[in-house]
């Protein structure tokens, strides 16, 4: 029966460590076989055969094999625990990074909406003021036109003045519209730059966190391997 720890460690890219443990076990097995062959030679020279002694020797080999099997299973369980802890830390760091990213993006979006709303409010008030003034001017022009219908020259002069006023009002509206578009584009550009910078910082933080987790995991795995090998060899 293959231990669960050895199967999982093969997926984690650490088969050489298990091979080293198996190699150490093979060396011990070879030593025992060599010592066993020497005992067989000694037994051939000795005319008396101890059958009970051979049975006890076979039981000792089985006990040693069981202990090695238990150590390997414990070694696999330690690797499984380390991998599970690594996975939990990665999930924790990833969730924290995603949460921070969402908060920053929401803040950027909220700021952008507030700035756009502020611009809309300011320029709406200015547009309304100019339009109201223009309507008042037109009303005055109509009233003056009705009163001065018999005075053509004076009416023509007023008409020319009104045309100049209308041209100025239209020019003011055009300037306000162009300024509004320019400010809106500047806000969008600044927010895009801020979003790009935030995304770049988040990528750097994720890379640093991943590197830190990998280093901690490698150190923990090496410590587990040393501990398992020491318990296996000594």
UniProtKB/Swiss-Prot annotation:
Post-translational modification remark: Phosphorylated.
Tissue: Detected in spermatocytes (at protein level).
Signal sequence residues: none
Annotated stretches, region: Important for oligomerization and fiber formation: 67-72, 229-234
Record keywords, A-Z: Cell cycle, Cell division, Centromere, Chromosome, Coiled coil, DNA-binding, Meiosis, Nucleus, Phosphoprotein
Modified residues (Phosphothreonine): 198
Biased composition (Basic residues): 1-11
Subcellular localization: Nucleus; Chromosome; Chromosome, Centromere
Listed GO CC annotations: chromosome; chromosome, centromeric region; lateral element
Chain positions of motif Nuclear localization signal: 86-89
GO molecular function, one term: DNA binding
Keyword presence, Hydrolase: no
GO biological process: cell division; meiotic cell cycle; spermatid development
Bias kind Basic and acidic residues: ranges: 25-35
Region Interaction with DNA, annotated ranges: 51-56, 86-89
Similarity-based family: Belongs to the XLR/SYCP3 family.
Quaternary organization: Component of the lateral elements of synaptonemal complexes. Homotetramer; the tetrameric helix bundles assemble end to end into long homopolimeric fibers that exhibit a transversal striation with a periodicity of about 20 nm (in vitro). Interacts with SYCP2. Forms a complex with EWSR1, PRDM9, REC8 and SYCP1; complex formation is dependent of phosphorylated form of REC8 and requires PRDM9 bound to hotspot DNA; EWSR1 joins PRDM9 with the chromosomal axis through REC8.
Protein name: Synaptonemal complex protein 3
Protein source organism: Mesocricetus auratus (Golden hamster)
């Amino acid at each position: 029966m293959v231990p669960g720890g050895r199967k999982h460690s093969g997926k984690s890219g650490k088969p050489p460590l298990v091979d080293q443990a198996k190699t150490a076990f093979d060396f011990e097995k070879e030593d025992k076989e060599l010592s066993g062959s020497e005992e067989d030679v000694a037994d051939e020279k000795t005319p008396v055969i101890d059958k009970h002694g051979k049975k006890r020797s076979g039981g000792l080999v089985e006990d040693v094999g069981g202990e090695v099997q238990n150590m390997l299973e414990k070694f696999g369980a330690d690797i499984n625990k380390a991998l599970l802890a690594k996975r939990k830390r990665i999930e924790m760091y990833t969730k924290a990074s995603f949460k921070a990213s969402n908060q920053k993006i929401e803040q950027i979006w909220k700021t952008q909406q507030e700035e756009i709303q502020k611009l809309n409010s300011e320029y709406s008030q200015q547009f309304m003021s100019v339009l109201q003034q223009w309507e008042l001017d037109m009303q005055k022009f109509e009233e003056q036109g009705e009163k001065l219908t018999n005075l053509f020259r004076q009416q023509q002069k007023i008409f020319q003045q009104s045309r100049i006023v209308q041209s100025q009002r239209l020019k003011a509206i055009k300037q306000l519209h162009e300024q509004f578009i320019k400010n809106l584009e500047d806000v969008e550009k600044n927010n895009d730059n801020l979003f790009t910078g935030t995304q770049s910082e988040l990528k750097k933080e994720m890379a640093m966190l991943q590197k830190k987790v990998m280093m901690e995991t490698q150190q923990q795995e090496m410590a587990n391997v040393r501990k398992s090998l020491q318990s296996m060899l000594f």
